[in-house]
C-alpha cells in the first residue's frame, strides 16, 4: 500500500468513524475517544467506556473502586448470526494482572467495562486459573458453554440480537436476565451502538 502519509496520520485526515443510522450528522473524531484512550489502533470505539468521564472515575476511586488499565484495540463488532468476532489486540500489564488476582483473593469482584475487556482478561488466564500479564491477538469467543473464569460482572451497551457478544452477556448474567433487559430496551425504544443507551 502506497500512501502519502504515515498510516495513522492518513486515517486521521481522510478516515471517518463508523456511523449508525440514528446519528443525524458526523461527529468529530474526538467524540469517539473515551477517557481511557491512550494509543491509536481500534477499528471502533470501545463504546462501553464512552459514558465514563474523569470526574466519574475520580468519584469511583473516592468510593473505594480500584481501576485497572489495559490496552485494547477493538475490532469491528460482528452483526452476523454465528459469525465469530474478529481478533482483537490486547495487553494486560503485570500491575493489572496483580490487581485482578488480589481482588479475587480478598473476595472482591472484577467488573469489566466492555466485551473487549472480558475477552482480554479471559485470554490472559494461565492453566491454574490466574490472570497473568500477557499481550497478543485474541480470537476468544465466550458463550454460556465456555465458563467465565475471571470477570464477575460487565458494564456494556446494547448489542444486536444476533451478535456474538450477546452470547457473552448470557454467559455472565444468564439468559433470563438478558431477555428481560432486552425486552425493556425494546419497550422503551433504547438506542444501540456507540451513542446508544
Describe every region a protein language model picked out.
Residues 1-197:
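Surface-exposed, charge/polar-rich loops and edge strands
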Amino acid at each position: 500500500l502506497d500512501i502519502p502519509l504515515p498510516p495513522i496520520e492518513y486515517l486521521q485526515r481522510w478516515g471517518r468513524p463508523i456511523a449508525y443510522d440514528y446519528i443525524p450528522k458526523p461527529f468529530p473524531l474526538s467524540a469517539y475517544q473515551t477517557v481511557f484512550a491512550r494509543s491509536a489502533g481500534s477499528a471502533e470505539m470501545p463504546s462501553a467506556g464512552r459514558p465514563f468521564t474523569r470526574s466519574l472515575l475520580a468519584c469511583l476511586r473516592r468510593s473505594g473502586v480500584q481501576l485497572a488499565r489495559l490496552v485494547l484495540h477493538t475490532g469491528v463488532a460482528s452483526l452476523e448470526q454465528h459469525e465469530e468476532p474478529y481478533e482483537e489486540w490486547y495487553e494486560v500489564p503485570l500491575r493489572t494482572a496483580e490487581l485482578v488476582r488480589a481482588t479475587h483473593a480478598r473476595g472482591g469482584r472484577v467488573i469489566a467495562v466492555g466485551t473487549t475487556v472480558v475477552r482480554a482478561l479471559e485470554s490472559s488466564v494461565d492453566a491454574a486459573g490466574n490472570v497473568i500479564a500477557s499481550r497478543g491477538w485474541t480470537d476468544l469467543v465466550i458463550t454460556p458453554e465456555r465458563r467465565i473464569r475471571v470477570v464477575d460482572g460487565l458494564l456494556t451497551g446494547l448489542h444486536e440480537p444476533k451478535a456474538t457478544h450477546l452470547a457473552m452477556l448470557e454467559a455472565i448474567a444468564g439468559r433470563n436476565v438478558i431477555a428481560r433487559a432486552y425486552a425493556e430496551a425494546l419497550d422503551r425504544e433504547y438506542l444501540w451502538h456507540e451513542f446508544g443507551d
